């Protein structure tokens, strides 16, 4: 059997950090994610408050917009970089270095 990763407890916090670090409103973040046809813009607020969990496709878009590897979003032991690299250009591999959280929440 495969290993099931526990639900990330810091995901909502990290999604909000990304939007704020990029200086975007929730509506602008919705557009930047390219999610107009997948979700309503009001879902961004629900993701950031932890009331809803984004789909894999939306998580991939958040990682792309922020320029970080998706693992930085879903692994509670990893922090986002202090400065987000920004969107990854097509064909470019860009993995942001992340630091292990000193305050593990377990």
Walk through the language-model features, giving the residues of each.
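Residue-level signal for the short linker/turn that defines the boundary of a DNA-recognition helix
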Residues: 13, 23-24, 39, 54-57
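Residue-level recognition of specific faces of alpha-helices
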Residues: 14, 43-46, 72
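A short, Lys/Arg-rich alpha-helix, primarily the initiator
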Residues: 1-22
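Residue-level detection of the helix-turn-helix DNA-binding "recognition helix"
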Residues: 20, 34-35, 49-51, 78
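Short, charged recognition helix plus adjacent turn
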Residues: 2-5, 64, 74-106
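Hydrophobic micro-packing sites on short alpha-helices
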Residues: 29, 58-63, 73-74
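Short, basic-rich loop-to-helix N-cap that marks the start of a DNA-contacting helix
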Residues: 41-42, 49-64, 80
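Short alpha-helical DNA-recognition segment
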Residues: 22-46
């Amino acid at each position: 059997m495969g290993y099931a990763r526990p639900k990330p407890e810091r995901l909502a916090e990290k999604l909000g950090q990304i939007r704020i670090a990029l200086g975007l409103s929730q509506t602008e973040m919705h557009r930047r994610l390219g999610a107009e046809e997948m979700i309503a813009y009001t879902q961004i607020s629900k993701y950031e408050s932890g009331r809803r969990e984004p789909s894999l496709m939306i998580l991939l878009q958040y990682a792309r917009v922020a320029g970080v590897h998706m693992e930085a979003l879903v692994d509670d032991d990893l922090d986002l970089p202090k400065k987000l690299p920004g969107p990854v250009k097509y064909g470019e591999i860009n993995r942001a270095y992340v630091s292990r959280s000193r305050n593990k929440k377990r």
